[in-house]
């Protein structure tokens, strides 16, 4: 009887551990929105290290003004060029649509890039999708897609 109780206790511990591992990396909507807000703050302040660190090591950026980029180094190079624009900022135009996908969160919506070119303000309305996933307790953008909206 005592051995049986130990076996049940051991099985319970294993199941509890497996459930913890499965759900501990689940991203909440609040965490994903926090990453979105942090991304905007880093973008508006041209904080290169901050914005690059919003992405996972192997993050993918399908950029508005360039190519498909994979990894932080490629993403960094993209933002180095983009951050050269004067009066650069981004504004979210709506509340993001939220979808949970296997522990990750996808946020989609519209934003507008603003910058000065030849002394004239330019505004580029674009669509976005951010997929956020938690790794080792931190939420990262694993994929971002951005394209000009007509």
Indicate where each model-derived feature is located.
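A beta-strand edge to alpha-helix "cap/lid" segment located at domain peripheries
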Residues: 8, 23-35, 40-50, 60-150
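Disulfide-bonded cysteine motifs in exported proteins
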Residues: 1-4, 27
């Amino acid at each position: 009887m005592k051995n049986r109780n130990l076996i049940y206790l051991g099985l319970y511990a294993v199941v509890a551990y497996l459930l913890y591992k499965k759900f501990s990396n689940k991203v909440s909507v609040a965490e994903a929105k926090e990453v979105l807000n942090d991304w905007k703050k880093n973008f508006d302040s041209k904080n290169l290290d901050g914005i690059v660190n919003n992405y996972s090591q192997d993050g993918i950026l399908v950029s508005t003004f360039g190519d498909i980029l994979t990894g932080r180094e490629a993403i960094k190079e993209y933002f180095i060029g983009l951050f050269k624009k004067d009066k650069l900022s981004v504004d979210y135009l709506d509340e993001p649509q939220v979808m949970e996908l296997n522990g990750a969160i996808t946020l989609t919506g519209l934003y507008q890039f603003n910058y000065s070119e030849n002394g004239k303000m330019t505004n580029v309305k674009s669509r976005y999708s951010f997929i956020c996933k938690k790794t080792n307790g931190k939420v990262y953008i694993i994929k971002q897609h951005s394209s000009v909206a007509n």
